[in-house]
Amino acid sequence: KKLYEKRNLTVESTMKRLQKIMRILLVKRLESSKTAFKASLNNLRHYTQNMLDMLDKDQVFVCPDIDVNGEFAKANYNFAKATAAIEEKRIKKGGNNLCFSASDFNDDYKTKLENDRKIIDSLYERWSANEDDPKMDAFVESLDSVLFNPQTNTSGKLVIFTESVDTQNAIAKKAGKKHKVLQVSAANRNELQDTIKANFDANASEQRDDYDIIVTTEVLAEGVNLHRANVILNYDTPWNATRLMQRIGRVNRIGSDAK
């Protein structure tokens, strides 16, 4: 018996659940932006190739506590360097962080992975060849005429929310051609706290205008005042209605000058 059979894992049911989860995640990424969807396809290409490389080298890491694909990316996909780093962490962490051989997997597993890679490569190439982005075009077209219309945007400030850092980068690149854009994510929120407050919090003692647009992920969806702005754009819409209300609550605060 294969190792996973000895451990009595329900492979088929787990596989079906993962398929549904991946489908949902890809739909959400596509809903966010074309840029985010392409980034996800590119990640899937790398993840699939990483697995194929590990099978070829007879060194397959399955480590719940280690970002195996992240280690490959850090090593610029140098197999020896990546696997050395993974093995070092695996030994330190122990637990369920395991290394398998290719013989622990079904004989047709590699063939199926190779087929997956061909499909993903084809999808990525087709999406990369198409430069059209109607959603981003509509955003750029409405940026000054609608979102910064002085009749509705009386403060000259704009808050943009997105669930994806890839989408955030694309928005900032386009909007940054005419506006001063502040990008905030989990990676830099703490170091930008004073800047955020001075530029977007109506209650701040120091008021600055270094930025007129803040593009943020969900990291600022709660626990922060952004009410110097009275216009919010949800570039993508969270499926959780509570999260949407939390976003809107960033500008609907006591102290706002907006009517």
Feature roles, as predicted:
Residues 1-187, 192-198, 222:
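Helicase motor interdomain insertion/brace
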Residues 176-259:
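Conserved RecA-like P-loop NTPase helicase motor core
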